[in-house]
Amino acid sequence: MEKESLLSLFSSNPDKYYKVSLFDEKGFKRQNCRLCGKFFWSINYKESCPEHENYSFIDDPPTSKRLDFVNTWKELSSFFRKNDHELIQRYPVVCRWREDLYFTIASIVDFQRLMNGKIVFEIPKNPLIVPQMCLRFNDIENVGLTGRHYTSFCMIGQTCNADAPGGYWKDRCIELDHAFLKNVLGIQSEEITFVEDVWMGAGAFGNSLEYYVRGLELGNAVFTEFEGDQSNYRTLDSRIIDMGAGLERLSWITMGTPTSYDTTFGPVINKLKNMINIDIDLNSELLSQYFRIFAEKYSKYQNDIKLLKINISKELGVSYETLEKTILPYETLSVIADHTRTLLFAISDGSLPSNVGGGYNLRIILRRTLALLARFGWNVNLEDIIDLHIEQLKSMYPELKEHSNDVRTIIQIESGRYGSSKERMYSIAKSMLSSKKSPSVEHLIKMYESDGITPDFLLENGVIENIPPDFYLKLAELHTSHEPKQAAVVETVTGVRPTKLLYYENASIREFDARILKILNGKYLVLDQTAFYPRGGGQEPDFGYIEGVKITDVVKQNDIVIHKLENASKDSFSEDKIVHGIVDNSRRVAITKNHSATHILNSSARNILGSWVWQNSAFKEENYARLDITHHSALTREEIRHIENTANDVVQRNLPILINVFERSDAENRYSFRIYQGGAVPSNNVRIVNIDGWDIEACGGTHVNKTGEIGLIKILKSERIQDGVVRLEFVAGTNAVRYVQSQDSQLLHIAQSLGSSKEKVVESFDKTSGENELMKRKFRTLVNKFSDSMATIVSQKATTLRSGLKFFITYDDEIGDDYYIALGEKTIDNDPFLVYVALIQDQERIKVIAFVGIESRKIIKASRIAKEVSLKLGGTGGGGTDKFAQGGGTDKSKVQECLKNFENLLTSILDSSEKND
């Protein structure tokens, strides 16, 4: 379904889709834009729609009140509460409830849930108002430039289910929005224009009315009314009003400042100016005129901002240099204010800057901010700017203060990483300057992804003259959203009723009878009920037997459980037959303990490391489990120990594990979006696993009744598997006890080998290590002394070739390579014409060591010799320098041939070198 055709359909019947009672009451007339053909409603006659108007409110606001960002919200929330709207707190900017989104991109997303590919609306109060902070990264390069673009912005959500108690529809919605503009802000009706438009998404669609004042879009009322497509659609059971208004713009229209950044970030920018000691008159006539003209001409010149600025400078009668000197610092302050606010909300809500997923865009803006500060020589810490935002927003978003320490920690770590990479970045920039080549956008993207180099850094160092206008857009598009993971299925099962899940009704059931509903491919059974837990949520399936035939896999397809049989005969099963199933108890118990341990470890890690820790993924099977958590760095041994101790303390406390099913909205309201550790739940009902308040998650897996049943949790290993993700491998219960016992046995073996007790094994090891180190030093001394005397003998035994070059080759299967490296070094020091080669057997491999004296290096290189000999021995080549190189191979049968034919090989290398010369 195309937007244009849908708009044409709705516009053909304006009285049905767009006309509201307010239009008749106030005298709004439908008009057609002569420039773009759009239809709009206004009281006064206009030749064109407001999309073609200039920002005439700059320096001349049409409102009776002057309101900054926070006070605009106070006025708006007061108005809607007086008009029977429930005020709710913002949702996280990290969109945990939608698997297809990393971030909350609009206020309506708060109430959207995906079920079977369709959007379902779940509105907790009706009607409601929410100050939703949203994140979008498709306009990064426009932030600061246009006066109105952001990476984070507050979308006021006026949301209503028209068909639920308290609901209303189009007439009341537009009446309220108009009343706020006129009665609260003091904007006359003649100033307001409503533009016809449409919205569509995930099978739902409807018409919308955007409202403008003096060229600035303030809000968009979307009326989601239908589902289906243009040729075949029906009215939704619940029609939804989604009015989204930009708080930044509402504040801007009341102040008439040059840009919306002045009102949005006013206190932050003013204090930031003082911190970096620069003087910018935010109310200067030049700024007002510049941004008014910029807004008018931006669409025409958006691919060549420099040319646009040159043209504006001519129109204003100032030089481009003078204009840029004023505008550029102001633009940069606005960028820094925007980017740091975005980081504050994202990190507070649990996202980490990284090279993967949603964290990718966070790292882009963080590094861009650092590069801009460096470019202008502004000595200020990002953490201090973060504090300015927290102070400004404390009445709207008091929760930000709670996370300030965590945000500072992450910002400091990321800033340190960026600083430590500067030397490499400078080296690359210097190389690019020398090449005098202009990098393409694709090359710049590759440089950022591989080396973390922002175009702002290259601009600062003179590598590029301008940042390509679409650089940040293309970069952001790579990491804006992600496709939900799809589970593999055997084949699509149809025509059977949902499987009754006995393991939920009675967690201890291990034997059951069931009727066969369907047989697939002769080896898959669908039963009417089952006690076999299927693979899901990172938990591996139960095994066991059905009628004595082994079950080797169990999967769930929507509401149907499918059992895989091992080597079943054709006559073993038939549809409608009653069969007996037995679940492998020891496997179920082991996996169950591992699953409960996963929940305990996850919260333990969050308590020890920080609030940014979320479950990234998990895997639980019979003998082993792993938990991947979001964390900025590899874990230290001390951190691992703390997490393990905390987890086992929870086990020892024998906390009850309670499992209840809630309506999804109820679960979210009770426990917050922290419940979605394992991802979004595509169901109206959510199964909540509550470990007595220690950990509360939405989970469909099997769990013990009390934490004490787990017995023991032992972390085996921790590693940083990707940027921003740390993996914990662990065992629980009997497997943990066996692991500890195995470690104890190994420790006893080591103690016995050292002639010590287990209690004194460390002391004995240190003593033995010290003795070994002393022996190594004595051996090295002996090698050096012996090699001194042998060097002369080697030189005397060497064979002389042309040009004075001499060579010596030897083979040894007893003495290690330390001796021959020392000897080779001595021999070429004594004889600059010597080529020295040693073949040394090291278990199944023959090592090659080659040295070339300083005079012989003029005609032959050690690296070439090592490579050729290694190839003869079945290796792939050697590596090293002109003086010294190493290599090797595994074909021991070729050793004697190499010794015998080395002179011929050397001569061949010399001949080829002379030809190349």
What are these regions (language model features)?
Residues M1-E2:
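Interaction interfaces in information-processing and related assembly proteins
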Residues S42-S56:
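Cysteine-rich micro-motifs
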Residues S5-V20, D24-R30, G37, E53-D917:
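A glycine- and charged-residue-rich anion-binding loop/surface
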